[in-house]
């Protein structure tokens, strides 16, 4: 059973997600978050200590949830990319939070301090798949990972061309998933063949 403190924390995180996704870190207001969550500002501060720590908690919640919802496997890069596409549709706030963090805090370099080991495990899996001939060995594992994530986010909220929404027709989503899988297969998988 969820405790009252856990429910309170989640109400604050949900309201903060909406505020930060819409307005960024600098534009977000603690009073709006408190009002939207139905909590007082002192309650918000007692749980998170301030706006910056609250953003960090919101960001971590969405990034970690994405990793939990879409477990990585180097055995099926095309399928992983398609599952990421679906997850970005299900959690449009994720891409917006990533964008705001990149714009307002970490303009360059690694965006996920504290999660280095998480990504290092993915890079080891990619390197092992390269060694076994399933992923192109002429690319650095870091580059494979970056290209995979960026390609999967082609239609996410940070797209510079077209943003996909859950309201788009199912046939359009199917077409995009197929194109994404083909592009990843041809560009990252050894011999352009389906892995797995």
Task: Identify the residue ranges that each predicted region occupies.
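Short alpha-helical scaffolding segments that buttress acidic/His motifs in well-ordered protein cores
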Residues: 84, 98-102, 148, 152, ...
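Amphipathic alpha-helical linker/stalk segments
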Residues: 22, 56-83, 122
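C-terminal peripheral helix-coil segments that are non-catalytic and often amphipathic
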Residues: 86, 90, 120, 124-132, ...
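Amphipathic alpha-helical segments used for helix-helix packing
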Residues: 89-109, 158-165
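Amphipathic alpha-helical packing segments from all-alpha helical-bundle domains
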Residues: 67, 71, 106-132, 142-146
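Hydrophobic alpha-helical connector segments
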Residues: 68-96, 141-148
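Helix-turn-helix
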Residues: 11, 15, 19-53, 57
